[in-house]
């Protein structure tokens, strides 16, 4: 469905060739944008540190203190329910981890880092507790659901809304890396959630290595957004999250994944998918989309992770900067998908 760049003659650019003035202008613009981002990043972190509206840590959370309102669905490796604690509604995710008490305690310790999470782009965390052979994570309830569900209900995301979603996703990743020192590891539309205030936040990130190991994820669901280096068995890095971001943007913009197979549930379909990710040229947005957006996605989807953009470099790109400046009523858009 996407035009793919072909280079059958193996042409390469001359590294000693002179740079055109237009290229110099573009490079200067990127440098200026990068400086602008760097000068504002401290203010952004300061804003996060002084957030007033965020879930407070609740020390007495346990299974008996929660009233189950309704089942919300299945998350990565666990069931998610809307629950009520006193007058607070929250989303509880229950993950089976087994009967090893040392493992359970280690997971709860690792989750403790979320006490310090103060970002408008990361879903709030009330606390976690062990019950039988499960760990329950109690999080901020986002009443408009995930981008995955919104995409199914509403179709491709409007371009002005998409820009704001990308702004929020990249800022969320930067907060995870710079403040919590966490790599997301499973970035995709189903792990980006929205509320009726128009806030867009990341969830289900890999804060606990042991919990990640305990979660039984299907290989297909994960591999769809997986970077080529991860499929080859390479190390997971920040750049792997950026690849997943690029694939997610294509899906949100077109309501289609770059590689689709009718028999994706069988082993042949999975192998075809993995072959495409590793061997085929990177997917691109169709030419009908704005050039700045297409260049932004291209920067996310270099096969070589050393050439792939970092989160900071993405922030310096013209598309990201332009999306920041556009005023969009996200709350009105999000209210169309509010859960009853």
From Swiss-Prot:
The modification Phosphoserine is found at residue 214. Serine/threonine protein kinase involved in conjugation and sporulation. It is thought that it is phosphorylated by the byr2 protein kinase and that it can phosphorylate the spk1 kinase. When bound to bob1, is involved in the regulation of sexual differentiation. It catalyses: L-seryl-[protein] + ATP = O-phospho-L-seryl-[protein] + ADP + H(+); L-threonyl-[protein] + ATP = O-phospho-L-threonyl-[protein] + ADP + H(+); L-tyrosyl-[protein] + ATP = O-phospho-L-tyrosyl-[protein] + ADP + H(+). It is an enzyme of class 2 (transferase). The gene is byr1. Its EC number is 2.7.12.2. InterPro entries: Byr1-like_cat, Kinase-like_dom_sf, MAP_kinase_kinase, Prot_kinase_dom, Protein_kinase_ATP_BS, Ser/Thr_kinase_AS. Residues 66-320 form the Protein kinase domain. One of its GO terms (biological process) is conjugation with cellular fusion. Belongs to the protein kinase superfamily. STE Ser/Thr protein kinase family. MAP kinase kinase subfamily. It comes from Schizosaccharomyces pombe (strain 972 / ATCC 24843). This is Protein kinase byr1.
């Amino acid at each position: 469905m996407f035009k793919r760049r072909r280079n059958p003659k193996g042409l390469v650019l001359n590294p000693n060739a002179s740079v055109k003035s237009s290229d110099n202008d573009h490079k200067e613009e990127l440098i200026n944008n990068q400086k602008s981002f760097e000068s504002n990043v401290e203010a952004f972190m300061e804003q996060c540190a002084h957030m007033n509206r965020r879930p407070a840590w609740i020390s007495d959370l346990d299974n008996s203190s929660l009233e189950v309102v309704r089942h919300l669905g299945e998350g990565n490796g666990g069931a998610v329910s809307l629950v009520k604690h006193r007058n607070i509604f929250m989303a509880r995710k229950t993950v089976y981890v087994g009967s090893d008490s040392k493992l359970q305690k280690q997971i709860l310790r690792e989750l403790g880092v979320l006490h310090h999470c103060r970002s408008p782009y990361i879903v709030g965390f009330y606390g976690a507790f062990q019950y039988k052979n499960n760990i329950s994570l109690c999080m901020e309830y986002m009443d408009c659901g995930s981008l995955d569900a919104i995409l199914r209900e509403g179709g491709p995301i409007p371009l002005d809304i998409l820009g704001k979603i990308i702004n929020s996703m990249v800022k969320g990743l930067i907060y995870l890396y710079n403040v919590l020192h966490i790599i997301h590891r499973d970035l995709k539309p189903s792990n980006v959630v929205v509320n009726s205030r128009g806030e867009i936040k990341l969830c289900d990130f890999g804060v606990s290595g042991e919990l990640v190991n305990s979660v039984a994820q299907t290989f297909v669901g994960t591999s769809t957004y997986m970077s080529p280096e991860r499929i080859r068995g390479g190390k997971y890095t920040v750049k792997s999250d950026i690849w997943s971001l690029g694939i997610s943007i294509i899906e949100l913009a077109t309501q289609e994944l770059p590689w689709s197979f009718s028999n994706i549930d069988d082993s042949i379909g999975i192998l075809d998918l993995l072959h495409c990710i590793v061997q085929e040229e990177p997917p691109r947005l169709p030419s009908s989309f704005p050039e700045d957006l297409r260049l932004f996605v291209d920067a996310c989807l270099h096969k070589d992770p050393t050439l792939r953009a970092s989160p900071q470099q993405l922030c310096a790109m013209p598309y990201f900067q332009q999306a920041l400046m556009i005023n969009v009523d996200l709350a009105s858009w999000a209210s169309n998908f509010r859960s009853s």
